[in-house]
């Protein structure tokens, strides 16, 4: 019985050996084209971890701002913010995302703009409406 349990454990460990493999930027960009929402969401959330590959990740995240799923669009905006000034090409797309029908996308886009270019897009105070003292 112990041998069976040990054998089952070894089989499980071997099966999961590839589970923790970190995907490349190219693989994640490809996953953004998947038909299922979950794959796209995972990819868009992992892309910001590839900061050294901004040239590939940023255009893919810009494209993800047009996804049909709002969670993917939110994560794309957040991810672009993580790239900071390396994501300046995303500014027009993020400004367009500020008109999204989902308020969470609009807010994420605003935060991303502030992180990308704080001089041009200063953070707004949540405590008071803009334009009032």
Each language-model region and where it sits:
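Immediate post-signal-peptide N-terminus of mature secreted/exported proteins
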Residues: 25-36, 45
């Amino acid at each position: 019985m112990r041998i069976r349990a040990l054998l089952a454990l070894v089989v499980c460990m071997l099966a999961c050996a590839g589970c923790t493999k970190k995907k490349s930027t190219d693989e994640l960009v490809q996953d953004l084209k998947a038909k299922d929402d979950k794959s796209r969401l995972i990819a868009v959330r992992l892309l910001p971890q590839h900061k050294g590959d901004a040239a590939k990740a940023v255009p893919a995240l810009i494209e993800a701002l047009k996804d049909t799923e709002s969670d993917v669009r939110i994560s794309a905006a957040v991810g672009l913010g993580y790239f900071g000034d390396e994501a300046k090409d995303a500014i027009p797309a993020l400004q367009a995302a500020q008109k999204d029908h989902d308020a969470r996308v609009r807010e994420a886009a605003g935060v991303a703009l502030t992180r990308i270019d704080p001089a041009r897009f200063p953070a707004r105070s949540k405590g008071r409406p803009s334009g009032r003292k």
